[in-house]
């Protein structure tokens, strides 16, 4: 076949001289049937504004796509539909039957092309999901979780609102509640985090405690409250501290035992041993200060386990991501999550960030995510990620705040999503916990 130019219609407007205001008014006055539905009117036509996307050539090995570097001659025949396999190639979607294809929904429009993303390409380069409350973010996250489960990929979900609990159990996964059946070892916390939990103010006490933490961290082994107390006493004695000073420091360290989420820690190798395991961390009961510490510790443990090969490739999803990667003050989680985002691709560890206020997210992190799902969102929030909308036409971007629930704009770089497209998220087989309840019966 000859080369064909694939174009995207941005806007369309009908030109119908038979239905101008004056003639339409006269027809109404005399009861003459209008011609708005006529399809065989000689002077009636539609003007469409288009954008060339790709030049496609069919070969024995499929379609070869090239940048649109030719001028389409006037009078060239235009087809209003293209074959499904060509549409997938243009958008960068794999065949839905491929083993690594994540089936998420269908493109909005007459073609209804299935939206399938290549898990091996998309997940290691990280994903961003944004949208206002009730627009479909949690529905999509649940859909992705189902697809990962079906394909045998492990997933850890940091669930701020407890929305994935029931769905996790339906998929045979495990729900953990920090402070109840999930604790984090003291050694998984960073030095400033540990010092911030021990109520010491005297300079000598702070120096002794800091040195003790540094020594234990240098040992690169797991340690707990008892280990910290023993090391602090040893350091204090080497400083020539009096017994009452050592007693005060010991008493302060003992108070760490009252923090409910400090403990032995979870065996992540065992928790993620089965193919397709979903682990949901229900963080509803954690106050903001503890939430930061728990998520930071979990991320460090899982990252180190994956880096050393102790656990298989996996995906971690984080709801309300702006709490952990803020645009202004650095949270406890920012350092470790930033490291994961930079290094995740090299160790097969993907990250999915979900937020209803992307303007509060660290801008550098937003840019690093290679695949983005944009649901209906306020214009002020949309402007904060305007530079991350790839080649989405201005007309589509303008309509994002008015998108219906469950419909989103999908964008990415050329490796993940070749061209921006609007699609409707498909159905789910598990419970949706993010549904807005009815206030009046």
What are these regions (language model features)?
Residues 1-130, 144, 309-312:
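Basic- and hydrophobic-enriched, low-structure N-terminal and domain-boundary segments
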Residues 8, 143-144, 163, 193, ...:
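Alpha-helical scaffold elements adjacent to nucleotide-binding pockets in ATP/GTP-utilizing enzyme cores
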Residues 13-15, 54-57, 161-165, 181, ...:
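Conserved nucleotide-binding/hydrolysis micro-motifs of P-loop NTPases
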Residues 39-40, 197-200, 341-421:
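Conserved ATP-driven motor cores of ASCE-family P-loop NTPases powering translocation/secretion/packaging/pilus
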Residues 99-180, 363, 410, 441:
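Glycine-rich phosphate-binding loop of nucleotide-binding enzymes
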Residues 158, 318, 354-355:
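Hydrophobic residues in beta-strands of the RecA-like P-loop NTPase core, especially within AAA+ ATPase
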Residues 161-162, 166-169, 173-176, 186-341, ...:
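P-loop NTPase motor domains
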Residues 271-272, 405-441:
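Conserved P-loop NTPase motor module
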